């Protein structure tokens, strides 16, 4: 009940545009603490209890209330090691509290809680990222060229703040954000590593502005104006520029307008990569390439180079996307036809969208998480003394299950079998290390129970739909099946 009340208070503050007072609320940091604990399935978050203790949060709020927040980021205080530690702690706490404030209206739990109160309708944007692949399976077979785009980063932090002010109209929060960024500008590299979620939000906000303008020009439709940005004079000028731009294109540059209205153009993005695919010729794709480079530089003051956009033919190129390697391959098919007394064979080539999992990349991710070495040999993980055997097994099985669900759309399952073997043996080594015995003797004592934990999960969902004796169930398991409840990229699927 208290959590739901907190979400409703957030909604009230968000609708009225008053975000800055929420920084003084302790439940904000409790929400950030809870989301931090549930965010990763691989790493042990051992420092969360210290980082989000009520004593630290109250001390931080007291400093802000007393208008001593300049002391929090005072450079002279870095001479004291104890204060330097608190400095990093306070900055990280404020940054994650700020992110939870601006992120909370888009979280599924927030939407569900308000839906029960009939406050808002459920957002259509909260959909599975796996819905991209069924779309690609239907569309990409008819396309010819694809452009792999590395989205450039803004060259100055002020550009990020300018992009965010179109969505957040609370001037106090923006001033705090600007002061926060420029005060920590000297140690921005180390700070960004500790506060990845904070900088990821800023980056996504900047990309959102770029994409909203780009897709508006692409579709030549009315731009959906948000109520939170209509009061800014810069935004009004922006709408005027877009209107004038369309009029100029319609009157004088029909060729450029034709470029925007290409009905065979498809755009998909995740993280810092995006894909632009088209049925047109390579000349048309090169026009899009140089348009994007000029668009970034002139409209958003982001320096980019043509080398960040590579154009390839789909028949000779594979897409590295969302942890999969996708390609269009041709399957030869011989058809026998008979006319009266004569028969002949016809060779046809059928296009198929093939999706595989890169075993080398997955092993590299497992090695980075210390489940194995770079050659794929399983390693033992350090286990807590108070962890039971069932907790350790359940943790490894959960990782294996999440990987299996995420990569269930792969057309070849051999890579997943290797990953399951690594995780199973790593689990056995971890348990043997805990009991101070060998893996052989431990597996002999445990029997086939450990093996069943890792193997019985795969066919459970499919067997609920089809009988176990049905050949359809086995055929679906061998082929690709997409789980449409995937809302985030698996930690091990993110190879970058």
From Swiss-Prot:
Domain of life: Eukaryota
GO molecular function terms listed in the Swiss-Prot or TrEMBL record: RNA binding
Localization terms from the record: Plastid, Chloroplast
Main subcellular location: plastid
InterPro entries, alphabetized: Domain_X (IPR024937), Maturase_MatK (IPR002866), Maturase_MatK_N (IPR024942)
Listed GO CC annotations: chloroplast
Gene Ontology BP term (one): tRNA processing
Keywords per UniProt: Chloroplast, mRNA processing, Plastid, RNA-binding, tRNA processing
Family: Belongs to the intron maturase 2 family. MatK subfamily.
Job of this protein: Usually encoded in the trnK tRNA gene intron. Probably assists in splicing its own and other chloroplast group II introns.
Protein name, as recorded: Maturase K
Species for this entry: Paeonia lactiflora
Gene: matK
């Amino acid at each position: 009940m208290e959590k739901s009340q907190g979400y409703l208070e957030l909604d009230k503050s968000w609708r009225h545009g008053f975000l800055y007072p929420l920084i003084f609320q302790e439940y904000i940091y409790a929400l950030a603490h809870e989301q931090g604990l549930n965010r990763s399935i691989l790493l042990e978050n051992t420092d969360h209890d210290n980082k989000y203790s009520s004593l630290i949060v109250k001390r931080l709020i007291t400093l802000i209330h007393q208008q001593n927040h300049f002391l929090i980021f005072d450079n002279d205080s870095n001479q004291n090691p104890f204060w330097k530690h608190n400095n990093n702690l306070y900055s990280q706490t404020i940054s994650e509290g700020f992110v939870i404030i601006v992120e909370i209206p888009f979280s599924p739990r927030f939407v569900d809680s308000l839906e029960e109160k009939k406050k808002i309708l459920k957002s259509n944007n909260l959909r599975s990222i796996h819905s991209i692949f069924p779309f690609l399976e239907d569309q990409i077979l008819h396309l010819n060229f694809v452009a792999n785009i590395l989205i450039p980063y803004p060259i100055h932090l002020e550009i990020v703040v300018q992009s965010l002010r179109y969505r957040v109209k609370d001037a106090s929060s923006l001033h705090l954000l600007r002061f926060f960024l420029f005060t920590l500008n000297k140690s921005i590299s180390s700070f960004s590593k500790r506060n990845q979620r904070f900088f990821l939000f800023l980056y996504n906000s900047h990309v959102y502005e770029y994409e909203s303008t780009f897709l508006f020009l692409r579709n030549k439709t009315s731009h959906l104006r948000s109520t939170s940005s209509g009061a800014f004079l810069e935004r009004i000028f922006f709408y005027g520029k877009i209107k004038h731009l369309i009029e100029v294109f319609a009157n004088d540059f029909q060729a450029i307008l034709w470029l925007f209205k290409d009905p065979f153009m498809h755009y998909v993005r995740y993280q810092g990569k995006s894909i632009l695919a088209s049925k047109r010729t390579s000349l048309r794709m090169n026009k899009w390439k140089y348009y994007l480079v000029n668009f970034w530089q002139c409209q958003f003051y982001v320096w980019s180079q043509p080398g960040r956009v590579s154009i390839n033919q789909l028949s000779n190129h594979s897409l590295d996307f969302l942890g999969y390697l996708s390609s269009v391959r041709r399957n030869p098919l011989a058809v026998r036809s008979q006319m009266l007394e004569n028969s002949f064979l016809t060779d046809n080539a059928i296009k198929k969208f093939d999706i595989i999992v890169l075993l080398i990349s997955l092993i590299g991710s497992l090695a980075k998480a210390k489940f194995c070495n770079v050659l794929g040999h399983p390693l033992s993980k350090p286990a807590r003394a108070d962890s039971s055997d069932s907790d350790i097994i359940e943790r490894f099985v959960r990782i294996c299950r999440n990987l299996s669900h995420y990569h269930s759309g792969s057309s070849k399952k051999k890579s997943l079998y290797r990953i399951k073997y690594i995780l199973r043996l790593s689990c056995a080594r971890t348990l043997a290390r805990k009991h101070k015995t060998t893996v052989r003797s431990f597996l002999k004592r445990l029997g086939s129970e450990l093996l069943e934990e890792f193997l019985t999960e795969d066919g459970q969902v499919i067997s609920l739909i089809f009988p176990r004796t049905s050949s359809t169930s086995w055929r679906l398991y061998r082929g690709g099946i997409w789980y449409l409840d995937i809302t985030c990229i698996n930690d091990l699927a993110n190879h970058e």
